[in-house]
Amino acid sequence: MRLILSLPVLVVVLSMVLEGPAPAQAAGEISSTFERIPDKLKEFGNTLEDKARAAIESIKKSDIPAKTRNWFSEAFKKVKEHLKTAFS
């Protein structure tokens, strides 16, 4: 008889323990999380800034902008010549 009564009590106690802290107890953790948000945002912004600067520098050092500019100017010249011959 005692075993039958102790098993439901054990289940209830385990469910209470595994449930975690009550909302009133967790309030301190939430406030500390909100206090850390500006620091995390600043860290994220600095990381993003560093990565953006590195990407811009690598683009500046590569020859992709010059090749793109040359390709567009050649394509524009071809279209211009084609239109001249078509409407002349």
From Swiss-Prot:
Family that this chain belongs to: Belongs to the apolipoprotein C1 family.
GO BP annotations, alphabetical order: lipid transport; lipoprotein metabolic process; negative regulation of cholesterol transport; negative regulation of lipid catabolic process; negative regulation of very-low-density lipoprotein particle clearance; triglyceride metabolic process; very-low-density lipoprotein particle clearance
Gene3D superfamilies assigned: Apolipoprotein C-I (4.10.260.30)
Name of the protein in question: Apolipoprotein C-I
Molecular function terms from GO: fatty acid binding; phospholipase inhibitor activity
Subcellular location: Secreted
Principal localisation: secreted
Higher taxonomy: Eukaryota, Metazoa, Chordata, Craniata, Vertebrata
Xref: Pfam families: ApoC-I
Organism: Canis lupus familiaris (Dog)
Signal sequence, renumbered to the chain: 1-26
Annotated tissue distribution: Expressed in the liver.
Role according to the record: Inhibitor of lipoprotein binding to the low density lipoprotein (LDL) receptor, LDL receptor-related protein, and very low density lipoprotein (VLDL) receptor. Associates with high density lipoproteins (HDL) and the triacylglycerol-rich lipoproteins in the plasma and makes up about 10% of the protein of the VLDL and 2% of that of HDL. Appears to interfere directly with fatty acid uptake and is also the major plasma inhibitor of cholesteryl ester transfer protein (CETP). Binds free fatty acids and reduces their intracellular esterification.
Cellular component terms (Gene Ontology): high-density lipoprotein particle; very-low-density lipoprotein particle
Keywords: Lipid transport, Secreted, Signal, Transport, VLDL
InterPro entries (alphabetical): ApoC-1_sf, ApoC-I
Presence of the UniProt keyword Zinc in the record: no
